[in-house]
Amino acid sequence: MFLAVWILYATDRLLDGVGGTAEDMEARHRFHRRHRRGFEIALTSASLALIPLVLAMPATSLRLYIGLAVLLAGWFLVVHRLTRNWRLKLPKELMPGLFCAAAAFIPVWANRGFDHLELACAAIAFGVLIIFNCLCIYAWEHQQMADAHWTTRLGVRYLTQLGVATVLLSLLAIALAGEQMAPIFIATALAATLLLALNQIRGALEPTDLRAASDLVLLTPLLVAPFLR
């Protein structure tokens, strides 16, 4: 999962740097463009390392991942090709939450099915957390919202409320979940709380530092990993 997510992230950053000027790019895009050759070598190596892991997957999980990969490839095509030609506005801050939640929970869905309330709550809470993370980053890096999709503008306008809703959803899930699932929701609630705190002090930090911190808080599952069974 780590390799696949990194491959998608790095590929997305490299595609963002195609055809643009350095002045129009964020710092992370300039970094990936400057070191493009190194990233291409690393991406090739990571892809080769991923092949045996993919082939070892259970057939049910593999079929679901193939379907998700097709949808994701279509999304990349729309974002990096059609939007530039047709000047489309897309809900870029919403889609990572949908794709990440689906990718993270496919193995469990494949083994347990889709009719588990606890699993649905976990997937929704995780997806909303990723969306909240993306909206925070967008709000921190952009002063103007005119070019954003209406869903992004709406999310940024109610950013604090979305963060509070994520925390409350996670707390409700903790109350409903059994002992086995509770640590997952605790990690989600903690990450959302930390993102809310970062948003409150955003004026004291540089955008690059804020982005790094926003990614760091998503590592909260490491804190509860010893309690997962």
Region locations from a protein language model:
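Extended hydrophobic alpha-helices typical of membrane-associated regions
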Residues: 186-229
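Intramembrane alpha-helical segments
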Residues: 35-111
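Small-residue-rich segments of transmembrane alpha-helices in multi-pass membrane proteins
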Residues: 29-37, 93-109, 154-166, 212-227
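Helix-coil boundary and interhelical linker segments in multi-pass alpha-helical membrane proteins
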Residues: 1, 50-64, 104-124, 172-183, ...
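Functional transmembrane core segments of multi-pass inner-membrane proteins
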Residues: 93-136, 142
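Glycine/small-residue-rich hydrophobic helix-like segments
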Residues: 148-198
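Transmembrane alpha-helical segments that form the membrane-embedded catalytic/substrate-channel core
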Residues: 3-18, 70-82, 125-142, 192-202
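Solvent-exposed interhelical
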Residues: 9-41, 129-167
